[in-house]
Every structure is written in structure tokens, then in C-alpha cells.
Amino acid sequence: MSVSAFNRRWAAVILEALTRHGVRHICIAPGSRSTPLTLAAAENSAFIHHTHFDERGLGHLALGLAKVSKQPVAVIVTSGTAVANLYPALIEAGLTGEKLILLTADRPPELIDCGVNQAIRQPGMFASHPTHSISLPRPTQDIPARWLVSTIDHALGTLHAGGVHINCPFAEPLYGEMDDTGLSWQQRLGDWWQDDKPWLREAPRLESEKQRDWFFWRQKRGVVVAGRMSAEEGKKAALWAQTLGWPLIGDVLSQTGQPLPCADLWLGNAKATSELQQAQIVVQLGSSLTGKRLQQWQASCEPVEYWIVDDIEGRLDPAHHRGRRLIANIADWLELHPAEKCQPWCVEIPRLAEQAMQAVIARRDAFGEAQLAHRVCDYLPEQGQLFVGNSLVVRLIDALSQLPAGYPVYSNRGASGIDGLLSTAAGVQRASGKPTLAIVGDLSALYDLNALALLRQVSAPLVLIVVNNNGGQIFSLLPTPKSERECFYLMPQNVHFEHAAAMFELKYHRPQNWQELETVLADAWRTPTTTVIEMVVNDTDGAQTLQQLLAQVSHL
């Protein structure tokens, strides 16, 4: 009997089972112990293969692919610390709802905890973060193939969001020619191999039903809080709120067009919060709110009812309001709860939003970080998409810009780490095939610098703007101790990115003004390659501009 041949047949069943649940993208890191999985993936024509030498970046690449495709994405890694490097992407997926299937190769049990190289305790290493964890046995013909395929089917058939960890131990030898070992074991699945359906089909999830008293609540004074949504959901939500006559407070990821722009500014005005206190119901569509003032208002508001609608399960309200947690696809929920045409009940807030935007426009000429955040809507590629980094840049765009309704915007706003942002952006571009504008800070770019290797392979123009404010200037907005701020919080690195771009043979530009930036962008959108644009700005200007605008708008 050939161990290597049966390893491959066992792996082939696993990989084929994944295809029955919509897995098309598969991300593979180099490794020996994962050879059965890698070869099975390579031989299965249903997969689009992606490779990367860094497992942490590979996990985030898969995350980006899943964000756009809305389908589960598989990742194959070898044993040892390679597995641990998938943790950040798994955590993010669990919070933002992407589906990741982590196939981690392992040593067989007799080689664990006895000094064998590259052997660690992998089962359960991700604790409670995966939605499902499966520790498979060593491949053996004593276990029927129908057990293996139904085990995979159960985990994926009940997966609505987050990750599945499938730990796969393989004994040596890992290499060798294929023979008939295990062929009859594999063939006992019969015509399943010619079918395209799961062996075991799970019943669909039951979503929240129509709220029978909606006809009553839609006639009341309401507020719509729009969190992270798809482009389709964002457009529908904006029209729904407009019809109801309810003010919509839109997050940067809401894709609603933010009809009341600069919410993070005008929510700091007492007139706005006073008017919002009249709301009898708040309906929050989507989660992951970015703006600090929006988070503060959400925590302090006291409507009679607070409803949260999202297809992600779990508690999504840090303020623990009395109300309803409705698990549903947002677009479907809006169809079930039609708006009734009413006149807008808020008078002060639209005026404040307009004045706040005018205050931002008055400062748009300086070549700076805050001004880029405001101007970003002018630089978006046609029929494209935007990927926004974390820390200061996403807060500035949220507060100072007004993105078009229905324009796709992506970010990692679950755990909101700065790790893996370039890798995630690469996945977003690959899955969509669209022109992509990605904006990150200098520390974020440094953190994921080797992901520039992924950006060498793009199917449409990709522009990466690195806003270099020389450190983590988000801490300038926080009451960090002034004497320790630079050394222990900002951590300026005093570096530039020209040589990093050259190392990976990417185009690089460092514009000095808006005209130069716009010229570079116009050229970049013409060719399906990656262009790195480093925008060097004064260290604290972005944070200071935001603070000045907050003070100005609070006194309107």
C-alpha cells in the first residue's frame, strides 16, 4: 500500500467537497507537509490558484477575495508556525463575516510533543475564533469516504460567516507516484464525483421574519444608522431612509452616499444631538461604525426602540440598547419593510451637515492628509472600487469626504488592525478585476511590505497611495502623554518607499502638489499595473485639521 497515494486520495475528497460549497479561490503557501492538499488543489480544475510565500499575507489575500466574491475561500498551509500566521485573518473574518476555510497540514499524533521538528499542537489552537474546528484523523481506509465528505459538508453547510479550521495530519512518505491504493475507497462515493451537489445538504438558515408592527413604527420619528453594507444594500438603504423622511447617518463603509456628510463633525454640535433626541426609533443597518462621535451618540441615545439589522449573528450593540437584534440580509429586510412616504422631521441637521461640508471645502487647497481624505471622491476610478486602510486615514475619509452612493468600498474594520492591509487589497482587486484605489498609512505599508509581491499580479489598474505622516499619527488625536508620545506611540521610522517599489518592479511617484498627483493618477488608470504613490505630508497636520474642524463645527 502506498501511503503517499492514499494521502492524495484523502486530500482529493476534501478539496472536491469544498467545490460543492462554492469554493473557487484557493490560496496556497509553500510547504512539504501540505503536499497532498496542494497537489489535490492543483489537479482540481474548479479552483483559481493564488500563491504567496508569507502565510500571514496569504490569509489576508484570502480575506480580500472573500470580501468581494461573497463565497468561501480556502487556504492551504504547512504545519508549525505557518498555521499561527493565519490567526489575524481568521479573527477579522469572524468579525466581518467573510468565509475562510483553513486547511492546515499537520504531523500525525505520534510525532507531536516529542521533539519532532516543525510539530506543534495545532488542534484547537485558534480557540473560539473559528465557527467550526475539525481535527481530522490520519488518512486511513478504515474510515469510509462518506464520513470524510459528510464531515466537511456539515461544517460548510452550516457556515454563515467566519472561518472553518480543518486540521489535516499526514504521515510520510508525502511524495511518490500515484497507484491504485485507495481507489476503491474513493469510488464508494459513486456518482457524487460526477455530481455538483454536497453529499450532505443542510437546511437553510431561518432569518428574521417581517416585524408585524413595522407599519406602526414607520410612522414615527426615526433615525437610520448605516454601518458596513454592500453597494446594493447602501443604495437601497439611502432611498428607504429618504422615503421615510428619516435622517441617515452613514459610515464610510455604508455605500449610501452619506446624504448628511461629515457626520463625525456635526455630531459634535449640541444642536444636532438635541434634535436626534426626538427620535422614537433607531434602525441600524450593518455594523462596524467608524466615527468617534457616531459611536458616542450611538452609546448615549435613548429611543423607545433600537433595531439592529445585519446578516452576521451575535451581539453588535456595545451600548446594549433595549430593542431587537434582527438577523437578515439587509436588502431582503428592506424589501420586507417598505417605507411610507413622509416629510423629513429633522430641520437642524441638514443645515449643519451642509455647513460642515463647506468648512471642509474651505480648507481643501493645502497639500495634506486631511485634504486628500476630502478629495478622494474626485480620484476614484470609473467602474472601480476603493480600499481604505485603518487608523487615521479611515477616520479622516469618514469625517471629511462624501463617497458616491453604491460605489464599492472595502476595509478591515472588524478588529481594525493595520496588519495585512496590502494583502487584503490585493485579494479585493483579484476577485473583482476592477480598477482599485487603495489608501493606507506609512506604518500600515511597512507592516505588510512584502505584500507588494502580490501587487505585481493585477488584472486592472491598482493605485496604492501611501500617506507618509511619519508614524502612527492617530495617537495625536488621543490623550497620550506628550513626553512619551513620539517614542512609544507615534514611532516615526523616517523612511520612504521608493526602493520598496523598485524591489518589486512597481511604478513609483512622489508628487509634491495636487496637480502632480492628478497627472500621475490619470496616467495610472490607463494601464493594468500597480502604481505606488507616496504622499509625504507634515506629521501632525491631518490630526490637527480634524481637531480644528471639530471645534469649528461644534460652535455653528
Curated annotation (Swiss-Prot):
Q: Is-annotated flag, keyword Metal-binding?
A: yes
Taxonomic lineage is: Bacteria, Pseudomonadati, Pseudomonadota, Gammaproteobacteria, Enterobacterales
Query: Could you say which cofactors this protein requires?
Result: Mg(2+); Mn(2+); thiamine diphosphate
Q: Which family does it belong to?
A: Belongs to the TPP enzyme family. MenD subfamily.
**Subunit text:** Homodimer.
| Membrane spanning stretches | none
Q: What is its EC number?
A: 2.2.1.9
Q: Which Gene3D superfamilies match?
A: 3.40.50.970, TPP-binding domain (3.40.50.1220)
Its keywords, alphabetically, are:
Magnesium, Manganese, Menaquinone biosynthesis, Metal-binding, Thiamine pyrophosphate, Transferase
Q: How is the cofactor bound?
A: Binds 1 thiamine pyrophosphate per subunit.
Question: Which pathway does the protein contribute to?
Answer: Quinol/quinone metabolism; 1,4-dihydroxy-2-naphthoate biosynthesis; 1,4-dihydroxy-2-naphthoate from chorismate: step 2/7; Quinol/quinone metabolism; menaquinone biosynthesis
Q: What is this protein called?
A: 2-succinyl-5-enolpyruvyl-6-hydroxy-3-cyclohexene-1-carboxylate synthase
Cite the PANTHER family for this sequence.
Answer: 2-SUCCINYL-5-ENOLPYRUVYL-6-HYDROXY-3-CYCLOHEXENE-1-CARBOXYLATE SYNTHASE, PROTEIN PHYLLO, CHLOROPLASTIC
From its record, what is one biological process in GO terms?
menaquinone biosynthetic process
Q: What is the documented function of this protein?
A: Catalyzes the thiamine diphosphate-dependent decarboxylation of 2-oxoglutarate and the subsequent addition of the resulting succinic semialdehyde-thiamine pyrophosphate anion to isochorismate to yield 2-succinyl-5-enolpyruvyl-6-hydroxy-3-cyclohexene-1-carboxylate (SEPHCHC).
What Pfam families does the annotation carry?
TPP_enzyme_C, TPP_enzyme_M_2, TPP_enzyme_N
Q: Name one GO molecular function term.
A: magnesium ion binding
User: InterPro entries, from UniProt?
Assistant: MenaQ_synth_MenD (IPR004433), MenD_middle (IPR032264), THDP-binding (IPR029061), Thiamin_PyroP_enz_TPP-bd_dom (IPR012001), TPP_enzyme_TPP-bd (IPR011766)
> Which reaction is recorded as catalysed by this protein?
isochorismate + 2-oxoglutarate + H(+) = 5-enolpyruvoyl-6-hydroxy-2-succinyl-cyclohex-3-ene-1-carboxylate + CO2
